[in-house]
Amino acid sequence: MPHITVDYTERLDDTLFDRHAFAKELDPLVVTESHSAGVGKIFFRPAPLTFVSGEEHPYVHVTIALLPNRSPAQKAHLSDAVLALLGRYVAGGPHVVTSVEVRDLPDSYRLRG
């Protein structure tokens, strides 16, 4: 049930960010670590321009939205696990900024299908 959005600098092509391999490992990691039922949904959104500290810079940000009731410690643990996974699939090491956010879905959330 997790909703995962990966925003990334468009110029990080498959040689610099292996999105397919990352997604294959990300889904089971998030479902297992968050103790979620169902399957995760992952959306990749390329951004033509990304800036860090006012300078154009490559960047990858993962947002994970879950149903409420996870503790801050559980969310932090999941963020750390996903950040470590990102490090395995984003080439360029410290030259690419990576971040992860785990948040609750709003009460209005509904799913069909």
What is each residue range found by the language model?
Residues 1-113:
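A domain-level signal for the structural core that forms small-molecule/cofactor-binding pockets
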